[in-house]
Amino acid sequence: MQERHTEQDYRALLIADTPIIDVRAPIEFEQGAMPAAINLPLMNNDERAAVGTCYKQQGSDAALALGHKLVAGEIRQQRMDAWRAACLQNPQGILCCARGGQRSHIVQSWLHAAGIDYPLVEGGYKALRQTAIQATIELAQKPIVLIGGCTGSGKTLLVQQQPNGVDLEGLARHRGSAFGRTLQPQLSQASFENLLAAEMLKTDARQNLRLWVLEDESRMIGSNHLPECLRERMTQAAIAVVEDPFEIRLERLNEEYFLRMHHDFTHAYGDEQGWQEYCEYLHHGLSAIKRRLGLQRYNELAARLDAALTTQLTTGSTDGHLAWLVPLLEEYYDPMYRYQLEKKAEKVVFRGEWAEVAEWVKAQ
């Protein structure tokens, strides 16, 4: 039975999106997991806690005996069936536990007895996690070009279209603003960092990468924060600023935040609940910046939002949203971004409309 235990092995697993059957307890998996991992635990949270308590009080032999007692009979058979199905569905996969210790070896031995030889990660999740951290530190040393611009400038799309681009907001499942949440919940911080490392490794492996193209992000993207090694390099990076006409930005924002989000919510929840979720999403975004807008201005814009939603519901038109979106951009988002950009004006190396910036980036 094979084991994978060198750093190059670990990196290869991440680059190949190798399916990982992670046998840690759900609570461990939720705290941090690799991108291609599926959680099929040897022990559930309660069983793991009981074995851990037994280990502290009575030692390893007693804990092991308790584990075998808890995972026996029908419970063991159900989990064996799940592992067997996962192995057959992912013949190129690999087993993983916390440190490559007893849990993955036990599952591996049970599978072997059932006629399935399946490799494991020697060093477990901890080794993969350290590999991800180290890879990010190393890859972040390459030069970086940041794509800047006011809200609605199409920065994310521009990054996505570059072979050396990494969509930080896509990985974080958040668009970085008060209205930035998506229908997918954000990952834990460790899982986000692991996903970022895997994406950087894959992007680097596909080409002779000379520089990264990233969006000009703040430290936080929703509830996730950028790894310090990458954030530090981004503060030193050159910036190309997209300066598109205001009307084009409004068209993008209408498509992204009104048409697409309404579609996504109704697709996920159905027409009635989807509409309620969509309304709540927009109100929550506006409410998040209430203090910065001031109560009077917030109330005015919230009333315009309500009117726009009524119009959208009755006619299907999203034009009414301009009544609150335009002042929100002119009075809040645009001044805020320009202030932030002024503080790093010496880093700006190019300005132009979207297509001009895209052409400039390709030439770098």
From Swiss-Prot:
Q: What is its EC number?
A: 2.9.1.3
Q: What is the active site of this protein? A: 97
Question: Nucleotide-binding as a keyword?
Answer: no
Q: Which residues form the Rhodanese domain?
A: 14-137
| Example GO molecular function | tRNA 2-selenouridine synthase activity
Top-tier EC class = transferase
One Pfam family here: Rhodanese
Record-annotated membrane-spanning stretches:
none
Q: Could you tell me the superkingdom of the organism this chain comes from? A: Bacteria
The family database entries (SMART domains) matched by this protein are listed as: RHOD
Which Gene3D superfamilies does the entry link to?
A: Rhodanese-like domain (3.40.250.10)
Give me any GO biological process, just one: tRNA wobble uridine modification
* Assigned keywords, A-Z: Selenium, Transferase
Catalysed reaction(s) here are: 5-methylaminomethyl-2-thiouridine(34) in tRNA + selenophosphate + (2E)-geranyl diphosphate + H2O + H(+) = 5-methylaminomethyl-2-selenouridine(34) in tRNA + (2E)-thiogeraniol + phosphate + diphosphate; 5-methylaminomethyl-2-thiouridine(34) in tRNA + (2E)-geranyl diphosphate = 5-methylaminomethyl-S-(2E)-geranyl-thiouridine(34) in tRNA + diphosphate; 5-methylaminomethyl-S-(2E)-geranyl-thiouridine(34) in tRNA + selenophosphate + H(+) = 5-methylaminomethyl-2-(Se-phospho)selenouridine(34) in tRNA + (2E)-thiogeraniol; 5-methylaminomethyl-2-(Se-phospho)selenouridine(34) in tRNA + H2O = 5-methylaminomethyl-2-selenouridine(34) in tRNA + phosphate
- What's this chain's function? Involved in the post-transcriptional modification of the uridine at the wobble position (U34) of tRNA(Lys), tRNA(Glu) and tRNA(Gln). Catalyzes the conversion of 2-thiouridine (S2U-RNA) to 2-selenouridine (Se2U-RNA). Acts in a two-step process involving geranylation of 2-thiouridine (S2U) to S-geranyl-2-thiouridine (geS2U) and subsequent selenation of the latter derivative to 2-selenouridine (Se2U) in the tRNA chain.
Tell me which NCBIfam families the record gives: PRK11784.1-1, PRK11784.1-3, tRNA_sel_U_synt
Q: How does it assemble?
A: Monomer.
Q: What family does the entry list?
A: Belongs to the SelU family.
Q: What is this protein called?
A: tRNA 2-selenouridine synthase
Designated gene of the protein? selU
